[in-house]
Amino acid sequence: MSMSDPIADMLTRIRNAQGVQKASVVMPSSKLKVAIAKVLKDEGYIDDYAVQEDGGKAQLSIGLKYYAGRPVIERIERVSKPGLRVYKGRSDIPQVMNGLGVAIISTPQGLMTDRKARATGVGGEVLCYVA
């Protein structure tokens, strides 16, 4: 059976794993999921990520990060969904928690944070908010 929204599945797996204090979470891999994991690592929300080949199917393993026993990611939510895509121009890119959080945006130059998209002067599809 095919999954209708693999990005929402990825975010839900991360949210659920952090809710039960797991050290890492494993999921099916894709180029977009790896790019999201790279942005999360660059912003300091996860420890590390790795792609492992498991019998012909690539698996993405994400090492979760905690501070003082609490998850570093307090909120992670999908914005643009398959049924309702959300696109923002360069002047309409939202701030998450007045700049304390991050919006991950898919642009023609690849995936990037809201701050980098504003600095670059590009808009795109708002995939998710992380705080």
Swiss-Prot record:
InterPro entries in the record: Ribosomal_uS8, Ribosomal_uS8_CS, Ribosomal_uS8_sf
Pfam families cross-referenced by the UniProt entry: Ribosomal_S8
GO cellular component, one term: ribonucleoprotein complex
Single GO biological process annotation from the record: translation
UniProt keyword annotations, A-Z: Ribonucleoprotein, Ribosomal protein, RNA-binding, rRNA-binding
Domain of life: Bacteria
UniProt GO MF annotations: rRNA binding; structural constituent of ribosome
Function: One of the primary rRNA binding proteins, it binds directly to 16S rRNA central domain where it helps coordinate assembly of the platform of the 30S subunit.
Stated family: Belongs to the universal ribosomal protein uS8 family.
Subunit structure: Part of the 30S ribosomal subunit. Contacts proteins S5 and S12.
Protein's recorded name: Small ribosomal subunit protein uS8
Organism: Cupriavidus necator (strain ATCC 17699 / DSM 428 / KCTC 22496 / NCIMB 10442 / H16 / Stanier 337) (Ralstonia eutropha)
Gene from which the chain derives: rpsH
